[in-house]
Structure formats: structure tokens, C-alpha cells
Amino acid sequence: MKRTLAIGDIHGGFRALKQVLERANVTENDKLIFLGDYVDGWSESSEIIQFLIRLSEKQECIFIKGNHDAWTEDWLSFRNASDVWLFNGGQSTVDSYSDYSQEDLEIHLEFFERMKNYHVGEENRLFIHAGYSSMHGPEKEVYFSNYRWDRTLWETAVAMDKKLSKNSELYPKRLLLYKEIFIGHTPTLHLGIKEPINKANVWNLDTGAAFTGALTIMDVDTKEFWQSDPLPALYPNEKGRNNIM
């Protein structure tokens, strides 16, 4: 049976990615939707991109672009590394590309350029890295950076009264547009939780792989999920992005 599986923020943790694909028994029949932030953090960002390029050649994959991916795309395009990016995990990505040829760098750049801002799948499910602010949906978003940086969508879902009916005038209009919304970007660790969180119709799959958490993959139909080992256990001699926690 073909499954649709969503994967949270990876942040250079290639070992974690391999673990969750194995633990979920992923086959070439499964559709994989990656929610972005493949890079910046642990030491294997370029290895992840190379793996994903090859993976997409043999099975259906959808790659959403995260804010860290946009930073890396800019660096691959212009070789201009901002201090903010380097501090937030970019240095590990730069280091991982140290032995790449210009031809291979261009292949990876093309991969970043092909990433999607968002994807609407079967049964009206939205997959987006961060969120959107327009009550008319992401296609009407004025500030495209919100696809990768917004936190208000998640904060709205978290703060909502659970008793609020969808028929209420107070129910957030932008949440009514989709059956379900799958996001990453804001680690569930911020709420002291190491597993995916569901608030209203929003599912947050960023379980803190950049920091002390694990990487998560979820079957979007059944909501069954699998996690890697905590990333510090997989990279015991590295800090990931824990320098900014």
C-alpha cells in the first residue's frame, strides 16, 4: 500500500535521516514530502542533498524549501556567507562542501532552486515549512518570506481554545482553508515536547533534530510516526545548533 510520509527538519543529520527511513520501512512505493531545512547544524548537509537528489530519481519526493535552505541557496549562488547564517548553522554547511567541484556545486544549487514553497496534497492537506499570514492562503501571500519564516500560524493554533467551534466567527479563517496543515520550522522542544504536536488542524513535525531532539517521519493518513535517536547521540563529537539554544 502506498503511503504519504512527511519528514521534519533534518539540519545536516544524515545519520538520523537514514534511521527514520529504515525504521518506517520506507519503500519506493511511498511518497515522501520533506518539510525543509535539510542543512545547517550537523556535519553532513552536503551528503543529505546528494542523497536526496539520488532518492528523487527512484521514488516520488516533494521538497519544500526552508529558511536555512534559502540561505544555502544564496551562498551557492553568490558565495556570500552572512554572519547570521554562519552563526545559525551555516558554517557546518560550508565546511561540508569544502571538497566539492564547481560542477557538483551547480548540481546542488539547481536542486535548491527546484524546491517548492509549499505543496497541497491529496484530501486538501497543505505542506509548508513555516506558515503564511494571508487569510486567503499561501497562494495569496504578500510576503513570500513567510513561507519559510512565519511563526504566527503555529502560535495561533497553539493558543486557540480547544472548545472553539469551526463555525465560530472567532475561528481563524486561514486554518479553515485546509483539512490539515503540516509544518516544521518551530521546534516542539520550545514546548518541552520531543514528539510531533497537533494543535487545531496543524501538525508540527520539527521535533528539534537541530538541537537535542530527534528527526521525525509521519504517515499523514494514520498519524503513525517514527523517530531517530536524539541527534547528539548520533553525532557525539558535534554541537549541531546547540550553541544558540
For every predicted segment, state its role:
Residues H11-A16, D40-S43, D69-E73, S134-M135, ...:
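Active-site environment of divalent metal-dependent phosphoester hydrolases
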Residues M1-F51:
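N-terminal active-site segment of His-dependent metallophosphoesterases
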Residues D104-I128, S133, P138-H190:
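His/acidic metal-ligating clusters that form di-metal
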Residues S168-D229:
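Conserved beta-sheet core of the metallophosphoesterase superfamily
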Residues D9, D37, G66-N67, T93, ...:
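Divalent metal-coordination and catalytic microenvironments
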Residues A6, L32-F34, F63-I64, L126, ...:
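Residue-level marker for buried hydrophobic side chains located in beta-strands
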Residues G41-E123, R148-A159:
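Active-site neighborhood of divalent metal-dependent phosphoester bond hydrolases
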Residues R3-H11, R125-G131, W203-L205:
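Active-site-proximal beta-strand elements of phosphoester/diester hydrolases
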